[in-house]
UniProtKB/Swiss-Prot annotation:
Cross-link (Glycyl lysine isopeptide (Lys-Gly) (interchain with G-Cter in SUMO2)): K66
Residue intervals on the Cytoplasmic side: 1-84
Gene3D superfamilies: Glycosidases, Golgi alpha-mannosidase II
Keyword Transcription among record annotations: no
GO cellular component: anchoring junction; apical plasma membrane; basolateral plasma membrane; lysosomal membrane; melanosome; membrane; plasma membrane
SUPFAM superfamilies named among the record's database cross-references: (Trans)glycosidases, Glycosyl hydrolase domain
Main localisation: membrane
InterPro entries membership: Glyco_hydro_13_cat_dom (IPR006047), Glyco_hydro_b (IPR013780), Glycoside_hydrolase_SF (IPR017853), SLC3A2 (IPR042280), SLC3A2_N (IPR031984)
Subunit description: Disulfide-linked heterodimer with a non-glycosylated light chain (SLC7A5, SLC7A6, SLC7A7, SLC7A8, SLC7A10 or SLC7A11). Interacts with TLCD3A/CT120 and ICAM1. Constitutively and specifically associates with beta-1 integrins (alpha-2/beta-1, alpha-3/beta-1, alpha-5/beta-1 and alpha-6/beta-1), but minimally with alpha-4/beta-1. Interacts with LAPTM4B; recruits SLC3A2 and SLC7A5 to lysosomes to promote leucine uptake into these organelles and is required for mTORC1 activation.
Chain positions carrying an annotated carbohydrate: N266, N325, N405
GO molecular function: aromatic amino acid transmembrane transporter activity; L-alanine transmembrane transporter activity; L-leucine transmembrane transporter activity; protein heterodimerization activity
Protein name, as recorded: Amino acid transporter heavy chain SLC3A2
Length: 529
């Protein structure tokens, strides 16, 4: 064995004995020291690599220095690359800007929205007899306030109330248009009701037909000047009280009606553009109706025009298109009479069809209380035809022969009821621009079919198809003579049907559109440029 080997062996033995001489806590200190040194322990030996680690570290790339980086960045290749990227960036930015300008310039212009008053945005709801509407012995303003929540669910925009003023039958002196009938309530109760209605976003229109309890609604022709003065004073009084509009009925019996209507409309308009005047007439003659409308373009007129002749699709198309063409730019109102119920003029099987019709024609639909549930005018024997008791629940039923599903409560729980249809149509009428103020185009379909398109600018289009007949019919609505902006597609989606059995959302081919008897369809399709 060589001398060097002997020395190494001695060092190994000393290293093996060294841990035995160390205290117990020295082991951890040694481990820490070895970890710091980067070595590993095996059988008491510590392997330390110093020179090799430093050489490896020196060989690793640490990046370019500032001077080296500037030198490389200034080389011709990198300079050309930077200029190319900068040029591409600005060319791309200018291209996107030019594209945006072209899109804006070539995009079709949006039509300017027409001026919309509150009565343009939804239906009006008439309550002429408070006691009959509430179906209780005490039909007063306080009780009517409790039904405002129900009116809110119908999404009507205005309540046509009364007449509720003091009227001594056929006695001008005993009639006070500024005083509320004590049986209905007091001025304070009316003010409270008015405030509650405004909180529900329901406008109140007061009926000021003077002699509503007498033989002639406007007294004698010789008293017309006195009555007209009373009406003018009443308009100013109730406008100051916060009423949103007025209705006067039977204006066909009023001497110089057009002259007085123009004067009364000037009073309401001078107070505020947001005040409404409604005139009612039982006339169905278009010439008489137009003579009344000529007095002022801001007048709503309810009449018996739509109920004048037999029920058929062809006849309804003629009446509607004739009326719209004759009134031109005048805002229309749609009803079947100035005060009566739908059931007084329409068979029960057509009630749903007429609801769809009135809600989708261009203008303001006007309904009487009970129209939403199909209330019959002869619900109670002996009651006046225009004052049937409203059927709220089973307690309102006049007899056991009347079904509970004719009540508000019964229909409220049925998604396929007439009441549910009324609410859905009222909701659609109030939120779709094409139904609010869109253009109207009637289509040629058949003798018992009436169909038309409602459209506005680039908004959703609506197609209404009504079958007034007693038999199933097939409508062919493919090609039509409509303007380009209102042309029909090959298919349209079903929004709702007056017959609950239809599956909503179904895409229907317009070339072969089958309808059941007395069925109405409301379809929609998107605007295509």
């Amino acid at each position: 064995m060589s001398q060097d080997t002997e020395v190494d062996m001695k060092e190994v033995e000393l290293n093996e004995l060294e841990p035995e001489k160390q205290p117990m806590n020295a082991a951890s200190e040694a481990a820490v020291a070895m970890a710091v040194a980067g070595g590993a322990e095996k059988n008491g030996l510590v392997k330390i690599k110093v020179a090799e680690d430093e050489a490896e570290a020196a060989a690793k790339f640490t990046g370019l220095s500032k001077e080296e980086l500037l030198k490389v960045a200034g080389s011709p290749g990198w300079v050309r690359t930077r200029w190319a990227l900068l040029l591409l960036f600005w060319l791309g930015w200018i291209g996107m800007l030019a594209g945006a300008v072209v899109i804006i310039v070539r995009a079709p212009r949006c039509r300017e929205l027409p001026v919309q008053r509150w009565w343009h945005k939804g239906a009006l709801y008439r309550v002429g007899d408070l006691q009959a509407f509430q179906a209780r012995d005490s039909g007063d303003l306080a009780g009517l306030k409790g039904h405002l929540d129900y009116l809110s669910t119908l999404k009507v925009k205005g309540l046509v109330l009364g007449p509720i003023h003091k009227n001594q039958e056929d006695d001008v002196a005993g009639t006070n248009l500024q005083e509320i009938n004590p049986a209905v309530g007091s001025k304070e109760e009316f003010d409270s009701f008015l405030q509650s209605a405004k909180k529900k976003s329901i406008r109140v229109i007061l009926d000021l037909t003077p002699n509503y309890l007498g033989q002639n609604s406007w007294f004698l022709p010789t008293q017309v000047d006195l009555v007209a003065t009373k009406v003018k004073d009443a308009l100013n009084f109730w406008l100051q009280a916060g009423v949103d509009g007025f209705q006067v009925r039977d204006v066909g019996n009023l001497t110089n009606a057009a002259l007085h209507l123009a004067e009364w409309r000037n009073i309401t308009k001078s107070f505020s553009e947001d005040r409404l005047l409604i005139a009612g007439t039982e006339s169905s003659d278009l010439h008489q109706i137009l003579s009344l409308l000529e007095s002022t373009k801001d007048l709503l007129l309810t009449s018996s025009y739509l109920s004048a002749s037999g029920v058929s699709g062809e006849n309804m198309k003629f009446l509607v298109t004739q009326y719209l063409n004759a009134t031109d730019s005048h805002w229309c109102s749609w009803s079947l009479s100035q005060a009566g119920l739908l059931t007084s003029f329409v068979p029960a099987q057509l009630l749903r069809l007429y609801q769809l019709l009135l809600f989708t024609l261009p203008g303001t639909p006007v309904f009487s209380y009970g129209d939403e549930i199909g209330l019959q005018a002869a619900a109670l024997p002996g009651e006046p035809a225009k004052a049937p008791v409203m059927l709220w629940d089973e307690s309102s039923l006049p007899s056991a022969s009347v079904s509970a599903n004719m009540t508000v409560k019964g229909q409220d729980e049925d998604s396929g009821s007439l009441l549910s249809l009324f609410r859905r149509l009222s909701d659609q009428r109030g939120k779709e621009r094409s139904l609010l103020h869109g253009d109207f185009h009637a289509l040629s379909t058949g003798s018992n079919l009436f169909s038309y398109v409602r459209h506005w600018d680039q908004n959703e289009r609506f197609l209404v198809v009504l079958n007034f007949g007693d038999e199933s019919l097939s409508a062919r609505l493919g090609a039509s003579s409509l303007p380009a902006g209102a042309s029909l597609p090959a298919r349209a989606d079903l929004l709702l049907s007056t017959h609950p059995g239809r599956e909503e959302g179904t895409s229907l081919a317009l070339e072969h559109l089958n309808l059941e008897p007395h069925e109405g369809l409301l379809l929609h399709f998107p605007y295509v440029a």
